[in-house]
Amino acid sequence: MSLLMHGHDWWLRVYKLVLIILLIAMKTFNEQVYDIVARIPAGRVATFGQIARMIGRPRMARFVGYASNNKASWHLPWHRVVFKDGSLCGPGFFEQQYRALKSEGVKFTRDKKVLIEQFQWDPERDAVPMDIRDFPLVF
């Protein structure tokens, strides 16, 4: 019996360790997402999948969306992140996102989808200067 309990304890510890590792990895993932979203220039949009690919996680577009739900990231220009077909996000945010993008000069189709071919952000073409804090100090 004690061997079984010891085995259960061991699995519980492994489970907790795996959860901690996943939480650390997710925090790093979210921080990478936030860094990219912060660099999307006005008048340009990026897709959830594009952001996921930029951080080397091409199958995690949905998790880019989850990252937007974190209150710590609400100061970021999430209105510049759209679906791959140019559709705007959810009903609660749709009109606000539409007005914000329109005020930045983004053009839409008749059914209010971003003209993605014309306004999708290309980081190489639309380079945004990095903050001096992004560079390590070298002595």
State where each predicted segment sits.
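Nucleic acid-binding interface residues in structured DNA/RNA-binding domains
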Residues: L23-F139
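Short, positively charged and aromatic/hydrophobic N-terminal segments
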Residues: Y15-L22
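Tryptophan (W) side chains
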Residues: W10-W11
